Amino acid sequence: MGFADQRFNVNLSILFTELPLLERPAAAAAAGFTAVELWWPWIDSPTPEQSELDALKSAIEDAGVQLTGLNFYAGQLPGPDRGALSIPGEESERFRANIDVAADFARSLGCTALNALYGNRVEGVDPAEQDRLALENLVLAARAADRIGAVLLVEALNKPESPRYPLVSAPAAIAVVDRVNEATGLGNAKFLMDLYHLSMNGEDLPQVIDAYAAKTGHVQIADNPGRGAPGTGSLPLEDLLDRLAKAGYDGWVGLEYKPGDDPSAQSFSWLPAGARAAR
């Protein structure tokens, strides 16, 4: 086994960002990849004009790549925010306005994974109130995902880089997954296992894989330290992905790493060109 046996997709919100958004799908295809994922591309608008949605849809289709993952609206990301769904007031309303927009866009491209970032803790607001709001919004998102045959992803981030984000361990994210599934009865909420974030939290990655592979709906990787390409840090990513496969995970692996100072297309030397197209 090894990297060549995985199904990789390129995150176009962190790779190829030296290019305009609409040029990134073709750049990923030119590098040999056949699948991409995105954070919500319109950070200032949960409900962009239909013409903007159509332009991105066309760029993805014209490039001949598959959209395999999409984030719901998450506030200013890139930026200080880490989601909107647990933020009382305007941000929660913006998330709700985005739910069907994101789900319909995903459905139009055959995308079957929607990621809902939880949101930062807000000073002066009871965490229990934020958690109640989060569950309400995640239930709505799970139902929208179910409507299009998709899974709803819940992601743990890392405390050093996201100190106000409450889900900074695998068990914390899994607890939310379980609460959402219990509330909806749909069973379509899944864990987004980001090996970079979990390693930054100091978690035992083999133990996390063994415990939670069955509840995992998507995996993302970057090396640590540095959040660079595999081989730039010290994480045994090839071994960890093999362990995931042996534990039963056969889904996508998102490349969510920083390309460094060189153009993104030069950051894939760790993966033979013939292994980049999904099989």
From Swiss-Prot:
Keyword terms of this UniProt record: Isomerase
Q: Does the keyword Cell wall biogenesis/degradation apply?
A: no
Give the positions the UniProt entry annotates as the active site: E155 (proton donor/acceptor), E256 (proton donor/acceptor)
Flavoprotein keyword on record: no
Catalytic activity, as annotated: 3-hydroxypyruvate = 2-hydroxy-3-oxopropanoate
Q: What is its EC number?
A: 5.3.1.22
Q: Which family does it belong to?
A: Belongs to the hyi family.
Q: What does this protein do?
A: Catalyzes the reversible isomerization between hydroxypyruvate and 2-hydroxy-3-oxopropanoate (also termed tartronate semialdehyde).
Name of the featured protein: Putative hydroxypyruvate isomerase
Q: Which organism is it from?
A: Streptomyces coelicolor (strain ATCC BAA-471 / A3(2) / M145)
